[in-house]
Amino acid sequence: MGHKVVVFDISVIRALWETRVKKHKAWQKKEVERLEKSALEKIKEEWNFVAECRRKGIPQAVYCKNGFIDTSVRLLDKIERNTLTRQSSLPKDRGKRSSAFVFELSGEHWTELPDSLKEQTHLREWYISNTLIQIIPTYIQLFQAMRILDLPKNQISHLPAEIGCLKNLKELNVGFNYLKSIPPELGDCENLERLDCSGNLELMELPFELSNLKQVTFVDISANKFSSVPICVLRMSNLQWLDISSNNLTDLPQDIDRLEELQSFLLYKNKLTYLPYSMLNLKKLTLLVVSGDHLVELPTALCDSSTPLKFVSLMDNPIDNAQCEDGNEIMESERDRQHFDKEVMKAYIEDLKERESVPSYTTKVSFSLQL
């Protein structure tokens, strides 16, 4: 006996499938609307916009008002046109005069500095980033007019002692490299004002000789392996900004109030259980960012709304990422994550500065997904 075929009215079957199709289309429409309204989509849009503005050198204050970002394309075009107009109105020889004293290098095809550089000892500023350069040559001591050494995101594993010969150096940025130590001779750069050693991951201490740097106002040693605030940092009497986040701190020194000029103190992503009462003596402190996961004791006056201090306690809830088998890949992934975290916090802190008050609490959630 063959298969028994039951024939229904075809119009009934068609109506059934048309209903299913309509429901599916309605679901698709709702899903599109949900994604458009999704916070993740909004975050993605805003961060892409912020990245584009930063790439074009547009100040945050222009596109961020009261904590909200205007992501309209018209605004971006308008800002870009105004920027180009201002640039075109500048004297034509201004850029040429400045570039004659500036050296710039970027790109992974660079594994060492060009030989011709040693002949250009008149240079005052170096901007070298995203290269595979591992060594800064000793002939750097010849650049006596050097003011700025901006060397982030390379593969520098060693700084020569000769860097101490740069008596006019004001800014040193060696963030997100592979440094495990800083030469004591850097303490001879008595005019240094900014020091950024963030994101080297393996850096554990700073030499005591850096105590001589009395003009330093900015120190960033975040994303390393410091177990305590370096003694030399406590002796930088003009320090205004200290970022020691993402390290291994479990406590702060009782004499932290030596930093009388300190205005911004970033301590989040450590394992601090308490804050010393000497923190109350930092009369100029206006921003304090900590991780509240382990914090159980702190001076209540720090949270007093009548003070100008903005106290931010982050609750960090990381989602474990899948571990790579290759140790180098793990290290690179950690370096990239730390860099991204810093960019997020930088934008958040810039926004905080424009607010009259901070949220009563903030939860920072780390996650990894494809947007």
From Swiss-Prot:
Transmembrane segments: none annotated. The keyword Cell cycle does not apply. Coiled coil: none annotated. SMART domains: LRR_BAC, LRR_TYP. Keywords: Leucine-rich repeat, Repeat. One of its GO terms (biological process) is intracellular signal transduction. SUPFAM superfamilies: L domain-like. Signal peptide: none annotated. InterPro entries: Leu-rich_rpt, Leu-rich_rpt_4, Leu-rich_rpt_typical-subtyp, LRR_dom_sf, LRR_domain-containing. LRR repeats lie at residues 122-143, 145-166, 168-189, 191-214, 215-235, 238-260, 261-283, 284-305, 308-329. This is Leucine-rich repeat-containing protein 2. It comes from Homo sapiens (Human).
